[in-house]
Amino acid sequence: MSNTYAFGKTVATDVGQTIERVTQALAKEGFGILSDIDVAGTLKKKLGLDLPAYRILGACNPQFAHRALEAEPEIGTLLPCNVVVRKVGAGTRVDIMDPLAVMQLVGKPEVATIASEVRGRLQRVLGEI
C-alpha cells in the first residue's frame, strides 16, 4: 500500500503475534493502547460478513498528546495514532498513521514539530516488528 497518510510493512507472523509485537514496540517508545477495534468481528456481528482479521489499535503517548493539546485544543479530533493490523495472504500487514501528514491539517509549526517527533518513534516501532 502506498499513500501519503500512512507507512507500513508486511510481516510473516500471524495477527495475534503481530499485535503482541506491535504493542511491545509501542510501549518501548512510550505509547499505550487506548482502543482496540476488531473491525472484522464488528462487521461479522452487524452485517454477517466473513472478512480476514482486521484490527485498529489506537496508540497514544501521553507526553506528546499533552504537548499537542496545549498547542491546539481541538487536536483531539485527530488523536490517537491509529495502527492497523490485518491479515493479508500468508502474512500480516501493519500500517501506521503518519502523524506528520495528518497534523499538517492543523497548520501550526509547533504541532508539526511534535508530529515529526512522534513519526520518528512510530517508524522505530515499525522497524522493531
What is each PLM-predicted segment?
Residues 3-5, 53, 79, 90:
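A generic structural signal for well-ordered coil/turn residues at beta-strand boundaries
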Residues 13, 17, 38, 113, ...:
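Conserved active-site and cofactor/substrate-binding residues in soluble primary-metabolism enzymes
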Residues 23, 40-41, 123:
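Short glycine-/small-residue-rich flexible loop motifs, especially phosphate/cofactor-binding loops
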Residues 28, 45-46, 128:
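Residues at alpha-helix termini
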Residues 32-84:
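Compact, glycine-rich, soluble single-domain proteins
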Residues 81-107:
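Beta-strand/loop substructures that line and gate deep hydrophobic ligand-binding cavities in soluble
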Residues 105-129:
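Well-ordered alpha/beta subsegment
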